Design a protein with these regions (language model features):
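Catalytic-site beta-strand/loop segments enriched in glycine and acidic/polar residues
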Residues: 52, 56-72, 175-216
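Long hydrophobic alpha-helices with heptad-repeat/coiled-coil character
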Residues: 147-150, 156-194, 262-293
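Acidic/His-rich structured neighborhood in mature extracellular/periplasmic domains
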Residues: 60-182, 198, 228, 234
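Domain-scale selection of a single, long terminal region
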Residues: 2-6
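Charged/polar, solvent-exposed surface patches and flexible loops
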Residues: 32-36, 50-54, 92, 107-111, ...
Length: 293
């Protein structure tokens, strides 16, 4: 076939997944692995866990992605296989698990990363609570208040997207300030309640920042350990790891205490928001990409 290159098709079938971790694969290899995973694991929740675990050890790097070359406010690319931060890890895992090919993965990734799938820094889901969670209601549903019941805690969050875009991305956008009250599960109740979560569910870590603001500061996924215990699989410095919720909380508290003893300001872990992976997911189409002005 004219123009075709041998060995570069992402739709070629493979008999077994590559032994190398996902973060060491080239896009062609990743595409074949995505197709293999979809064919050999029909259960979406298990497929999410398998793909996420295929990235254990992936090096952590903050602020990885942008809109380049679609937009040139920076030169950050629109996907990353070799590194991740917490959000990139979750987005790539969900997008791969929902796809059957590299092409579909790339489309799905943009559908998840941007409001209505419209690519642009102003439509990217920057804020976890009011952007990502709200825009991806077709994928996950916040069950934090339901899970915690009378023990639920909450915080007020105010988002000024226009100021954020202007100061961080040199982008002008007329977006009104938004305020919302967010429920979460206090950290003291998380280990007892985590058993109600299911594999593939979405985890938001809620922290009190040194400046007094409360917000989601980290995200990851629920997976099942060998004994059925709920584990937290996430990307954090230095690399993607899997651990129990108790271990994560203990590490966070030890880090906070270390900074306190050193006289340094620190954020404080308050608890977690949990979002249930929806059943019978129907991926909405992207909105038309508007012509740039």
């Amino acid at each position: 076939m004219p123009g075709a290159s041998a060995g570069t098709s992402t739709s070629e079938s493979i008999d077994a997944p590559p032994e190398k971790p996902l973060y060491q694969m080239r896009p062609v290899e990743a595409g074949r692995y995505i197709a293999w995973a979809h064919e050999h694991e029909p259960d979406l929740r298990k497929r999410i866990a398998a793909i996420a675990r295929k990235n254990i050890g992936q090096p952590y790097q903050l602020n990885l992605l942008g809109e380049f070359p679609y937009q040139v406010h920076d030169e950050l690319p629109m996907f990353s296989l070799d590194h991740s931060d917490c959000t990139v890890f979750v987005e790539h895992t969900y997008a791969m698990a929902l796809s059957t090919s590299w092409d579909e993965f790339f489309w799905m990734l943009q559908r998840i990363r941007y409001r209505d799938g419209i690519i642009g820094v102003a439509t990217r889901n920057h804020y976890t609570e009011l952007d990502w969670n709200a825009a991806n209601g077709w994928l996950v549903t916040d069950v934090s208040a339901q899970l915690a019941g009378p023990d639920a805690a909450s915080y007020m969050m105010t988002v000024d997207r226009a100021t954020f875009l202007k100061t961080r991305h040199r982008t002008e956008a007329a977006i009104p300030v938004e305020t919302s009250r967010q429920a979460y599960v206090p950290k003291a109740r998380v280990v007892a309640l985590a058993g109600q979560m299911q594999e593939g569910d979405y985890v938001n870590v809620v922290s009190l920042l040194a400046d007094g603001k409360t917000m989601v500061t980290h995200v990851g996924l629920v997976v099942l350990g060998p004994d059925g215990e709920r584990h937290f699989l996430h990307s954090s410095d230095p690399a993607v790891r899997e651990e129990t919720f108790a271990a994560f909380i203990a590490r966070a508290e030890a880090r906070e205490e270390g900074k306190r003893l050193a006289g340094k300001k620190s954020s404080t872990l308050l608890g977690f928001k949990f979002l249930r992976l929806n059943d019978n997911i129907v991926v909405p189409p992207m909105a038309p990409q508007p012509r740039p002005s």
